[in-house]
Regions:
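Contiguous, often N-terminal, cationic amphipathic patches that form binding interfaces
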Residues: 2-81, 110-114, 118, 123-125
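Short, non-transmembrane amphipathic alpha-helical segments
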Residues: 87-106, 110
Length: 125
């Protein structure tokens, strides 16, 4: 059974339209978040962890996109932070980076970005 995915129309003209799914937006958010120094990785739920161990790693693990209204989304991230980094500062950088990536690449307006810190990663573990 195929997953029920939300899609967004990002361009429509006489030649046709361009639609993207919420999965694409989640991947963009996840990649942007992991580019921030101090973010060790994304943290997924149990289902994501099982999928990852089965060899079907998803780039959107730990990311949820919520449609607020047409072309407006909220982002929920679950991340692991590296030990020794200032968590509020890292989270502010993640919020800025994710918002800019989604708005510039896709054209959707990001209304909020909520971050849950799942764990602190210690070097060597």
């Amino acid at each position: 059974m195929a997953e029920d995915r939300k899609s967004f129309v990002i361009r429509e003209n006489e030649n046709g339209g361009v639609n993207i799914t919420d999965e694409v937006v989640a991947i963009i958010a996840g990649l942007a978040a992991t580019e921030v120094e101090g973010v060790s990785s994304l943290a997924g739920n149990l289902t994501n962890e099982v999928i990852s161990k089965a060899g079907m790693n998803k780039l959107s693990k730990g990311v949820k996109i919520v449609t607020e209204e047409e072309n407006h989304v909220a982002v929920r991230l679950c991340v692991n932070i590296s030990y020794g980094y200032e968590i509020p500062k890292i989270c502010a950088q993640v919020q800025d980076k994710v918002k800019n990536a989604i708005e510039n690449m896709v054209g959707l307006e990001v209304t909020s970005i909520d971050i849950k810190i799942a764990s602190v990663a210690v070097a060597g573990e």
